[in-house]
Amino acid sequence: MAKKAVASRGARCYAWPPMRKRFFLPAAPRGARAPLRFAADAPWLAPLAGYSDLPFRLLCRHYGAAVCVTEMVSAKGLVHKSPGTGELLLSLPEDQPLVVQLFGAEPEVLGAAVLALRGAGYAWFDCNMGCSVPKVMRQGAGAALLGDTARALACARAMIGAAGGQGRVGFKLRLGLDRDRSILPDLALRLEDAGASWLALHPRTARQGFGGSADWEAIARLAARLSIPLLASGDLLTARDGVRCLAETGASGVMYARGALHDPAVFATHLALLRGKSPPAPDAAALRAMISLHVRLARQYGGDGGALLKMRSLAPRYVRFLPGVRVLRQRLCRCTDWQELEAALDEFLDGAVLS
């Protein structure tokens, strides 16, 4: 896809084209085949529907995310060339390695989607078998696959075969549909036998959604049974949670989701803790730098309209612990352009007092 080069402080960057109403599949950028890392010091950014777009991934990589996963991409949308699907795949060389997460319930469609992505240069794929959103489950996709092991395995084999064998495809799982219908360790072991390269486990059931507590003991039990990497997810709201989860479960690595939404610098804090360093307390200057970077990335790569709406939602999360954030949120909701939004954030941070 053509990109118009523009100057920015002596560096080469790109002005992203406006969003298109027709379907297009962007070619994977240089570095798309960079190897994945599974290690305590290689924290991943989880797939976050509506949030883990290119600007947010670049922000998280700035703070140390080793691998990022796209938002959920509909396999059917790719195969049938639905408008808007391709935008979820926009990337850059510095956004690598990147895992494309697909969702769907038809093995032949998932396989065809992987083939199309491989043809465009993408190298790493993930199948969502954990999304508990009713809209997704009604399609038989996401966590609904946990209730149909035969279909789940057929989908897995189709993706692995289309990807060219072992080493390219992972699967994100939950414990099962509910406590009475656990799929562990049976499905996980069968996915490993089918050629899965890695698994990620959010140790809640589909019925739980995000309620209750994540069962980290289930991660530990599964990690002890697998010979492929296992990424831990669930209740990793801070870097200390992530480091503690690694110690308690023996997982190969961690995947931050809500923790990254609240604080994209969670990756830097995670790495500091592993090195035995005390991370610095948050201050207004650090918050301003993080928010300013996200705004700049969103303006450059986020397309029209939607990027501003998304930033109006995200910015208050970053300063949620400061007094006056409710008023800020209300003010941001009335912002209709980037200048208004930046002025509101600057005014808020100028008066911020961090204890």
Where are the language model's segments positioned?
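Active-site beta-loop-alpha junctions enriched in small/polar residues
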Residues: 48-50, 73-75, 103-105, 130-132, ...
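Short glycine-enriched, charge-decorated loop/helix-capping segments at active-site entrances
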Residues: 140-146
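Alpha/beta enzyme core
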Residues: 112-125, 129-139, 150-228
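Short, positively charged and aromatic/hydrophobic N-terminal segments
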Residues: 7, 14-15
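Hydrophobic faces of well-ordered beta-strands that scaffold small-molecule active sites
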Residues: 43-47, 68-70, 98-102, 125, ...
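Extreme N-terminal basic, low-complexity initiation segments
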Residues: 1-9
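Glycine-rich, positively charged N-terminal anion/phosphate-binding segment
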Residues: 20-39, 48-123
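Alpha/beta catalytic cores of nucleotide-metabolism and tRNA/nucleoside-modifying enzymes
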Residues: 3, 16-44, 49, 54-55, ...
